[in-house]
C-alpha cells in the first residue's frame, strides 16, 4: 500500500486470491469496498469532523442560528462525502440521509439524529474498509508464504519455520 501525504490517492495492491474482500450484498458487482471509496483520506477527514461535531452538539444547547449553521454543515458534509465515494455508495448515502427543508429550522433532536445517522453509516463504512484491508493482507501473506515454500528445493525449510511442531537441531558441520 502506498500513501502520499500530499493528496488523497491511496493505492491498494490486491493478490490473486482477491475474492474475500468483496461485499456480499451485490453492490459494486464484485468490486471490493476499498475500490468503492475513491478518496479514502477525504472520507476519513470528513467522518472525523462529523463525529467531533456530533459530540459538540450533544454537549451544548442550540439556538436557531446554530441549528441553521449545523444544517448547512451537515448538507455540505454529505456533498463532500459523495465526491469521495463511488456511485454505489453515493446512492446508498442518498437513500439513507433525509434532506432538511430550507423553509424551517430543524430541531435539536432532528439535527442530532441526522448527525448520529451519518456517523453510524461512516463507522460502518470504516469497519468494512478495515475488514477488507485485513482480508487483503491475509491473502497476500498466504500467497507470499506459498511462494516461499514453492521456491525452495525439497527438504529445505524456511529458517524459523518448524516441521510438525518439533524443533530439530542442525545436522551439518559447524565451522
Swiss-Prot record:
One of its GO terms (cellular component) is proteasome complex. It comes from the Bacteria. Pfam families: BPA. GO terms for biological process: regulation of proteasomal protein catabolic process. Keywords: Proteasome. Residues 152-175 are annotated as: Disordered. Belongs to the Bpa family. This is Bacterial proteasome activator. It comes from Mycolicibacterium smegmatis (strain ATCC 700084 / mc(2)155) (Mycobacterium smegmatis). The lineage of its organism: Bacteria, Bacillati, Actinomycetota, Actinomycetes, Mycobacteriales. The gene is bpa.
Amino acid at each position: 500500500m502506498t500513501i502520499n501525504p500530499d493528496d488523497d490517492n491511496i493505492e491498494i495492491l490486491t493478490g490473486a486470491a482477491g475474492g474475500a474482500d468483496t461485499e456480499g450484498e451485490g453492490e459494486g458487482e464484485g468490486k471490493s469496498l476499498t475500490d468503492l471509496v475513491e478518496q479514502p483520506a477525504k472520507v476519513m477527514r470528513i467522518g472525523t469532523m462529523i463525529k467531533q461535531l456530533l459530540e459538540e452538539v450533544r454537549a451544548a444547547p442550540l439556538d436557531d442560528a446554530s441549528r441553521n449553521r449545523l444544517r448547512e454543515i451537515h448538507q455540505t458534509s454529505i456533498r463532500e462525502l459523495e465526491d469521495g465515494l463511488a456511485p454505489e455508495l453515493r446512492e446508498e448515502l442518498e437513500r439513507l440521509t433525509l434532506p432538511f427543508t430550507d423553509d424551517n429550522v430543524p430541531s435539536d433532536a432532528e439535527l442530532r439524529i441526522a448527525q448520529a445517522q451519518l456517523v453510524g453509516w461512516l463507522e460502518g463504512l470504516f469497519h468494512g474498509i478495515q475488514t477488507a484491508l485485513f482480508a487483503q493482507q491475509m491473502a497476500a501473506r498466504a500467497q507470499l508464504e506459498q511462494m516461499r515454500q514453492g521456491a525452495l528445493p525439497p527438504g529445505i525449510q524456511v529458517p524459523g519455520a518448524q516441521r510438525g511442531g518439533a524443533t530439530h537441531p542442525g545436522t551439518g558441520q559447524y565451522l
